[in-house]
A protein has these predicted regions:
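Low-complexity acidic/polar repeat-biased segments
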Residues: 100-120
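Beta-strand-rich interaction surfaces with strong enrichment in secreted/lumenal proteins
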Residues: 43-45, 95-99
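Short, charge-rich binding segments
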Residues: 57, 98-101
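Exposed extracellular interaction/assembly regions and N-terminal maturation sites
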Residues: 4-83, 114-120
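Short edge-strand/loop segments of extracellular domains
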Residues: 83-93
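Short solvent-exposed loop/turn micro-motifs enriched in small/polar/acidic residues
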Residues: 2, 28, 91, 100-102
């Protein structure tokens, strides 16, 4: 997408262009019961045959992003479990796993820093 800047409060002119944010979608669909993921990627997770435990990176930088999508709309039957791998998740330490189980759901998580960790 691109366009022209006109009629703005500071009377500026020029052009704009929108570029992708740098997230890469992994081309193969995850069907395994476990997967270790990498920041900067999007993953289609197919839980038709089994639930999937997703292990997050053991280190992260503020702004790191990962997206998961329900490829076959089956998370309600076989959900995903996120293992935060030693980092905080929504401010909670890594003593529990986070579960998502809604058909058709997608989850985008961003690393905010050590205090809150990964935040959806």
């Amino acid at each position: 997408m691109s366009g022209t800047i006109e009629n703005n409060i500071s009377n500026q002119s020029g052009s704009i262009a929108v570029a992708p944010a740098g997230l890469n979608w992994v081309s193969s669909v995850v069907t395994a019961s476990t997967v270790t993921v990498v920041a900067g990627n999007g993953y289609w997770i197919n839980t038709t045959s089994n639930a999937c435990t997703i292990t997050l990176p053991s280190s992260a930088s503020a702004g790191d992003t990962i997206i998961f999508g329900d490829y076959a709309r089956t998370w309600g039957t076989n959900g995903i479990v996120i293992d935060s791998n030693g980092l905080n998740y929504q401010g909670d330490d890594d003593t529990f796993d986070v579960e998502y189980g809604t058909d058709g759901q997608s989850v985008e998580i961003v690393y905010s820093g050590a205090t809150k960790g990964w935040i959806p």
